[in-house]
Amino acid sequence: MSIENSKEAALTAELSLAGAFFYTPECPDIEHLRSLSVANRWLDTDLPISDDLKDVAKLTPAEREFYRFLFAFLSAADDLVNLNLGDLSALFTQKDILHYYIEQESIEVTHSRVYSAIQLMLFGNDAAARARYVASIIGDAAIGRKVAWLQAKVRECGSVAEKYILMILIEGLFFASSFASIAYLRTHNLFVVTCQSNDLISRDEAIHTRASCCIYNNYLGGFEKPEPKRIYELFSEAVNIECEFLLSHAPQYSHLLDIGAIISYVRYSADRLLGEIGLSPLFNAPKPSPSFPLAFMTVEKHTNFFERRSTAYSGTLINDL
């Protein structure tokens, strides 16, 4: 190596080392999503969940059991996602990605607190009754199947890229039927504040899903990506698990829900996610009708949902759930 080349290599190494101690823009797409998430910050204290207590009595016993089940799962699911985030963020040196994950973990804490408050409200603020229910439902087969499937697939992961496919499935599919089921309450003017929180959380998860897709597409160059056959296999299994999860506790006779429409939405969501990572659709599910509560969910500006506090939401990100 010539003296000139040696000096250039030394300078490059020096600059690289120095770059570890200050922020340099490297990932414009991820930085955009981080900035969007910051602009959309909200707090669990923004939402007076107790205002919805009056609507609990308006549910049938089967409907009440169904929503208690959903929120028991959702309360636990955010902890599962946070555990995975801590593992994934250590893979990157780009500060844009590290900063994004810090922001995501922060909002997941808000989600967890809101879910806990809604869950307690569904038990008439009886903490002991809630605790007994959670202790009995935590071993439910439908929840257990989701967790067992995810744990098994993490153990089987042949690459970091495949783990990102799992993150896309967690964030984009494993909440889809729950979000849709909660959104149906809005169509009957029930649980207004709970539906408000569902709007905000589902939009946050849209950002998280988009970020996972961006990282998978653009920042895993050093990792071998799974074959399309493997990705389709994972998507197919995840959709089946999500649909069975819904059917396992959905009330058989309820005017609140359209179970068929929710299942179609889950499949449509899977096809959209496949498109985000450059693959053809698997289910060819139709786009939800305009009457579907989540059909036009976007991360766009909405102010004063119920005239208590401005909860303006910025951006134009399409929901990838």
From Swiss-Prot:
Enzyme Commission number, as recorded: 1.17.4.1
Record GO cellular component, one term: membrane
Example GO molecular function: metal ion binding
Positions of the catalytic residues: 115
Binding site for Fe cation 1: 78, 108, 111
The protein's role, per its UniProt record: Ribonucleoside-diphosphate reductase holoenzyme provides the precursors necessary for viral DNA synthesis. Allows virus growth in non-dividing cells, as well as reactivation from latency in infected hosts. Catalyzes the biosynthesis of deoxyribonucleotides from the corresponding ribonucleotides.
Assembly and oligomerization: Heterotetramer composed of a homodimer of the large subunit (R1) and a homodimer of the small subunit (R2). Larger multisubunit protein complex are also active, composed of (R1)n(R2)n.
UniProt family annotation: Belongs to the ribonucleoside diphosphate reductase small chain family.
Protein name as annotated: Ribonucleoside-diphosphate reductase small subunit
Lineage of the organism: Viruses, Duplodnaviria, Heunggongvirae, Peploviricota, Herviviricetes
